[in-house]
Regions:
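Gram-negative bacterial Sec-dependent N-terminal signal peptides
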Residues: 12, 17-19, 24, 28-60
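Small-residue (G/S/T/A) turn/hinge positions that recur once per unit in extracellular repeat modules
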Residues: 69-70, 76, 91, 99, ...
Length: 740
């Protein structure tokens, strides 16, 4: 093939060059020094044109190719169209302290170009600028189809444009930036484009990326970054939309340790469906600061914060973003995930936005954030685990199951502090669950509500010394579709809100058992509004306490505007200042005190305030009336019924007792006092309190047992003895018979 050669004078090198096609092929000598010196100039001046043509081979003087065992040193200013190091064989290019290499045109430079090739560029105090004469960034492929390595040390400086490590399938590219004032600047940085790429920044080395940084770009690629020992990577510019991607379609891993630093804008881990990304932040003073963190966008993402490592989030974070994605954050061994700034608008965390998300905090790990929501969208599933002493989440609110499924487990003295409203089962499709066990605690502060079952389903389970404390009201079953359940399971477990509303507009259930304690010293409402249905079961030596030394509220209301039911059984105890059953004319309330040592203790007792209320004392269950007064059917059109033993028309049961009462009074509604018990002894069931009231609708039913009235009763209405024996032990001179 005919070739055209031309001899030109290179002003930079001060030599004649014979140019042909695209590249200058440096001969197969072991060492070439490209430097500005009189000897080099004289040597080339003595060469004949034929020798110059022979040196040119099949390449052009526009590119520098270092290959076939060649080692080339640059310690002066040079400029080429491209740098090709390790084209088919092995090549080493050293850019030394006084060396400055730059580009003249738009060609891509390559280290480790073809299969089985191996190229190395060492920038040892020199400068390599990969921009053309028009200041346009040009590509550098490190490990194109072979193996490529770029080492930047001894205050070396590389101005990179588009840098790709492992740019083809099966190839390997590595960049090492080591030492203070050793610098790599890039615009687009792909670490593992199609093959395998590694970036190591150590000993205060410094790297910047101003457009995008990607680890594991294409499917089956692998990108790995280690930033350590004061190394730093800055991934940002004036545009906050710049992205740091870890595991785009391939596998990516970034590790920050021993004081390494990364600063980035939007960070995406596990970007696409095939993407697998991992971010590790470990050791004291190891920090990554990001604007927004997307962990598991379409793919799989994992964040590990450990050993005092720190992540600073300027705005929000989504973990398990899209349907089918999976994201995990592990904060352990004094690691810290911190959200900067104030307010809740940009500091929130979604664990399981539309995908599957996990947040695990253990071994003194710490999270400080805005509102945390687990199970945000309908397809989202979020799980939060906080365990071990001094492991803490502090946030502006906790939502479990917004429209999806959310669960939180607090154990082994782990702590969650919510300084804002919190909910379980927010939307109609939302399902939220919280388990507090083995000394775990959830505190809700700042005078805000906690709602279990807003419009969805919420469950709060407390056992083995778990604790819940709130500075305000807790609602169960807030909206009509809401279903809320609270289970307190043992003697060391407690639930301490200011007040509790069980079945506000929806359905609420509270079960307190095995010696557990529920404190709601403001008030307790069961069946709060017209559509509300609430049930509270206090059993097996457990306590519901509504009393304090304060004179404020402390009311127990069963059937406020809706339907309420309170069951005190097997030694359960309820203490309140005043107890009211069925407050509204359309409300309904039922209270049952059943069993030895079962106790309802209240100052005054109102059964059927304006609605239909029933109190049943059976099987030695006791009503202790500290204020001495019991009212039945207080206002029209109320119906208030007090059953001793069993209800009228039912099979007789063992009687319960009233202590410290001075009177039972029928109000202006309908009062009903039923004696249907099994005490048939000669002494009978003793009734010492006065039965009084001017309500002509008042009734005393005697269905079974032997009952003895000891007071001079003055009630109006009827006394109906259907069965059993009623003894009147009080007869006065003015004609009061004790039968009303």
């Amino acid at each position: 093939m005919n070739r055209i050669y031309r001899v030109i004078w290179n002003c930079t090198l001060q030599v004649f060059q014979a140019c042909s096609e695209l590249t200058l092929r440096v001969g197969k000598t072991s060492m070439v020094n490209l430097r500005k010196s009189s000897g080099l100039t004289t040597k080339f001046r003595r060469l004949t044109l034929g020798v110059l043509l022979a040196l040119s081979g099949s390449a052009s003087g526009a590119s520098l190719e270092v290959d076939n065992g060649q080692i080339t040193n640059i310690d002066t200013d040079v400029a080429y169209d491209a740098y090709l190091v390790g084209w088919y064989g092995t090549g080493v290019l050293n850019i030394l302290a006084d060396g400055s290499a730059s580009l003249t045109t738009i060609t891509t430079s390559v280290i480790g170009a073809n299969e089985d090739s191996e190229g190395t560029v060492n920038v040892l105090g020199g400068t390599w600028r990969l921009y053309d004469s028009g200041n346009n960034a040009r590509p550098l492929n490190v490990g194109q189809s072979g193996t490529g390595t770029l080492n930047i040390k001894q205050k070396g400086h590389v101005d990179g444009g588009y840098l790709r490590l492992g740019s083809s399938t099966g190839d390997v590219g590595t960049v090492n930036v080591e030492g203070e004032d050793s610098v790599l600047t890039t615009e687009l940085f792909e670490i593992g484009s199609y093959g395998t790429g590694s970036l190591n920044i150590t000993d205060k080395g410094y790297v910047t990326s101003s457009i995008v940084a990607i680890l594991g770009y294409q499917a089956n690629s692998n990108g790995k970054v280690v930033v350590e020992k004061g190394g730093e990577w800055l991934i940002k510019n004036n545009d906050s939309s710049i992205e740091f991607q870890i595991g785009n379609q391939g596998t990516g891993e970034a590790t920050i340790l021993e004081g390494g630093l990364i600063t980035a804008e939007n960070t995406i881990i596990g970007g696409n469906a095939t993407g697998i990304g991992t971010l590790n932040v470990q050791d004291q003073d190891s920090v990554i600061t990001v604007r927004r963190l997307y962990n598991g966008y379409f793919g799989n993402g994992t964040v590990n914060i450990s050993n005092n490592g720190l992540i600073n989030n300027k705005e929000y974070s989504l973990v398990g973003v899209q349907d089918g994605s999976h994201g995990v954050v592990n904060v352990t061994d004094k690691g810290h995930w911190n959200f900067l700034g104030t307010g809740e608008a940009f500091r929130y965390i979604y664990i399981g936005d539309a995908g599957d998300g996990e947040l695990n905090v253990s071994s003194e790990g710490k999270v400080d954030s805005g509102i945390i929501t687990a199970g945000m969208k309908e397809t989202g599933t979020g799980n939060i685990t906080v365990k071990d002493k001094n492991s803490v989440i502090t946030n502006l609110g906790t939502n479990l199951g917004y429209d999806g499924h959310g669960e939180m487990n607090i154990s082994n003295e782990g702590l969650v502090v919510s300084n804002g409203g919190s909910s379980l089962g927010y939307g109609e499709t939302g399902v939220g669950k919280v388990n507090i066990t083995t000394g775990g605690m959830w505190e809700v502060n700042k005078n805000v509500y906690t709602t279990i079952g807003v419009a969805g389903v919420g469950n709060l389970n407390i056992s083995d010394g778990g604790k819940f404390v709130s500075q305000n009201i807790t609602f169960l079953g807030d909206k009509a579709s809401g279903i809320g359940t609270l289970n307190l399971m043992d003697a060391t477990s407690s639930f301490d809100p200011v007040g509790i509303n069980v079945g506000n507009f929806g359905s609420g259930i509270v079960n307190v058992s095995n010696g557990a304690t529920l404190n709601s010293t403001g008030y307790g409402f069961i069946g709060g509004n017209a559509s509300g249905k609430g049930i509270v079961n206090i059993s097996t030596d457990s306590l519901w306490n509504l009393k304090t030394s304060s004179t404020n509220a402390q009311l127990l209301q069963v059937g406020v505007l809706g339907t309420g039911e309170l069951n005190i059984t097997t030694g359960g105890i309820v203490k309140a200042r005043d107890t009211q059953i069925a407050l509204n004319d359309k409300s309904k309330g039922d209270v049952r005190v059943d069993g030895q040592n079962s106790l309802l203790e209240t100052f005054n007792m109102y059964v059927g305030t304006s609605g239909t209320g029933t109190l049943t004392l059976t099987n030695s269950g006791t009503l202790n009336v500290e204020g001495g007064e019991v009212y039945l059917g207080v206002f029209e059109p109320a119906v208030g019924t007090l059953n001793i033993g069993a209800a009228h028309g039912e099979a007789a049961a063992d009687a319960g007792y009233i202590t410290n009462a001075t009177k039972v009074e029928f109000g202006s509604g309908e009062g009903v006092f039923v004696f249907n018990h099994t005490n048939n002894s000669d002494a009978g069931y003793q009734v010492d309190m006065l039965i009084t009231g001017d309500d002509k609708d008042g009734k005393v039913f005697h269905d079974a047992g032997h009952t003895v009235f000891n007071a001079g009763n003055t009630y109006s209405g009827k006394t109906l003895v259907n069965d059993g024996l009623l003894t009147i032990a009080s007869h006065t001179a003015d004609g009061v018979t004790g039968m009303g």
